[in-house]
């Protein structure tokens, strides 16, 4: 974007909030890597990366966070024009699997989820309380439960992502970073479902695609390259699933069920997220064109990114508190030469 505005300024407002949010998720994933051992077995080529509802039982609400600065913003109406009558709160489950019990106790001790809740409360005004929980679900999953008004992140998903990314990570730190990014992407995706429901936001078209767009946009708005790497990890997580399906030998009936699902196919999600990352900064990510992003799609990606960013900011603007008031700087992609939106040849 031309001019004095900084398109990399944090969606969650002050950079201190962004750093704390990213650190929180990094610590969560680091804890998971200490307790979950996985095998390496995938042939997916990601060389370009180098540049079900369940019962909510036995849950208790935590006490208030001691982070007074963030909590102060969380408790204020701020610049939001819609009333702020609710809060994101934290609930802890009682997992049965010993390795999940250890994680759960670590989360409680370090108050990691409370920090996330307070930072979101400093950003968005909501009319009712919403719970955030990590829990044992019986399968890899993350979901918004409209009945219990809760965002649910499953320990099994963290374990699956650790296993999947171990097959492509260069070392333990790279594994940590990739799982951190993909889990953050999944959380913001479910937060998007929550906001559409709780705020009664209009969603024309497929809601699953809309919240993928929100997650990508929020991550790309982070300072520096950290958010871009997280968004790339989100894309790669779907690329890995796509690779698994391609090699699974599923029957026609099983594939038909995938086509009929409310989500886009894993491969489509992979390419969509890559497109929006490229559209955000074509010059930086020109290497993605044809490796693997098709050129015919790439020429339209800057316009796609601008539209999705503008749409989400328009929907959320009345609800953005002091912690989210700077988000309007992110509506345009970075400067780049990609021809026009009706087709053109990328400059290579």
Segment roles from a protein language model:
Residues 176-196:
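Short alpha-helix carrying the canonical HExxH Zn2+-binding catalytic motif
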Residues 75, 81, 86-89, 253-348:
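Pan-zinc metallopeptidase signature
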Residues 4-25:
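Bacterial N-terminal signal peptides that target proteins for export
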Residues 204-223:
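An active-site-proximal "capping" alpha-helix that borders the catalytic cofactor pocket
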Residues 34-37:
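C-terminal motif of bacterial Sec signal peptides marking the signal peptidase cleavage site
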Residues 220-278:
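Active-site/pore-lining binding-face segments in mid-to-C-terminal subdomains
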Residues 128-144, 212-213, 228-245:
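Acidic helix-start/capping segments at beta-turn-to-alpha-helix junctions
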């Amino acid at each position: 974007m031309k001019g004095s505005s900084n398109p990399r300024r944090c969606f969650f407002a002050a950079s201190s909030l962004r750093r704390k949010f990213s650190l929180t998720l990094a610590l969560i994933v680091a804890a998971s890597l200490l307790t979950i051992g996985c095998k390496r077995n995938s042939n997916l080529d990601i060389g370009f990366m180098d540049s079900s509802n369940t019962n909510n039982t036995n849950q208790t609400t935590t006490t208030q966070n001691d982070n007074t600065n963030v909590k102060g913003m969380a408790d204020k109406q701020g610049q939001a024009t819609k009333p702020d009558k609710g809060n994101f709160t934290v609930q802890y489950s009682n997992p049965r699997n010993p390795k999940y019990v250890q994680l759960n106790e670590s989360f409680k001790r370090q108050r990691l989820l409370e920090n996330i809740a307070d930072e979101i409360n400093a950003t968005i005004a909501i009319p009712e309380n919403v719970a955030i929980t990590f829990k044992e679900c019986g399968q890899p999953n993350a979901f918004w439960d409209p009945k219990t008004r809760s965002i649910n992140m499953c320990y099994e998903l963290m374990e699956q992502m650790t296993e999947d990314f171990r097959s492509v990570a260069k070392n333990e730190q790279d594994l940590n970073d990739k799982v951190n990014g993909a889990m953050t992407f999944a959380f913001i995706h479910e937060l998007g479902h929550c906001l559409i429901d709780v705020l009664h936001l209009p969603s024309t078209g497929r809601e699953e695609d809309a919240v993928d767009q929100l997650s990508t946009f929020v991550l790309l708005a982070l300072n520096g390259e950290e958010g871009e790497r997280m968004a790339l990890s989100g894309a790669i997580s779907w690329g890995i699933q796509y690779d698994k399906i391609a090699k699974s030998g599923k029957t026609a009936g099983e594939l038909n069920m995938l086509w009929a699902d409310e989500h886009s196919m894993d491969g489509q999600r992979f390419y969509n997220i890559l497109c929006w990352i490229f559209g955000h900064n074509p010059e930086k990510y020109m290497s993605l064109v044809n490796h693997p992003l098709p050129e015919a799609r790439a020429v339209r990606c800057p316009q796609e990114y601008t539209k999705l960013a503008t749409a989400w900011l328009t929907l959320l603007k009345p609800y953005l508190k002091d912690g989210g008031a700077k988000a309007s700087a992110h509506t345009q992609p970075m400067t780049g030469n990609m021809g026009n939106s009706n087709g053109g040849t990328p400059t290579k």
